[in-house]
Amino acid sequence: MNIPQELKYTKDHEWVKIDGDTVTIGVTDFAQGELGDIVYVEVETLDETLDKEEVFGTVEAVKTVSDLYMPVSGEIIEFNESLEDEPEKVNEDPYGEGWMIKIKLSDTSELEDLLSADEYKEVVGS
């Protein structure tokens, strides 16, 4: 299982890449593996400001639909529109082309609540 050291994680299986006050968010390799083949990604919260742990979208797989949760508070400034036509990118490259949203961070102190790669490995039993 791929768990890049440079990223931060949540117990809800989202990953977070921090670049100043812009944060890129997606689902982890573990999450995409558990979901199975992803057929649809829906994010209707573009340009909205959401609080940590609010739902920002859904991901639909062959067998299930799962909510996507904000790992930190912020304004959603970008959605990876390529996922509309190619949702399988989430399965194929969850940490690269399968990213989901970018947000403008509201509260940098919330970053301290995120898990390191090693802490996330403990969550998934890796």
From Swiss-Prot:
PROSITE patterns: BIOTINYL_LIPOYL, LIPOYL
Source species, domain of life: Bacteria
Note on cofactor: Binds 1 lipoyl cofactor covalently.
Modified residues (N6-lipoyllysine): K63
UniProt keyword annotations, A-Z: Lipoyl
InterPro entries linked: 2-oxoA_DH_lipoyl-BS, Biotin_lipoyl, GCV_H, GCV_H/Fam206, GCV_H_sub, Single_hybrid_motif
Biological processes per GO annotation: glycine decarboxylation via glycine cleavage system
Needed cofactors: (R)-lipoate
Boundaries of every Lipoyl-binding domain copy: 22-104
Residues making up the signal peptide according to the UniProt record: none
Record GO cellular component, one term: glycine cleavage complex
Family to which the UniProt record says this protein belongs: Belongs to the GcvH family.
Chain's role: The glycine cleavage system catalyzes the degradation of glycine. The H protein shuttles the methylamine group of glycine from the P protein to the T protein.
Subunit-level organization: The glycine cleavage system is composed of four proteins: P, T, L and H.
Identification of the protein by name: Glycine cleavage system H protein
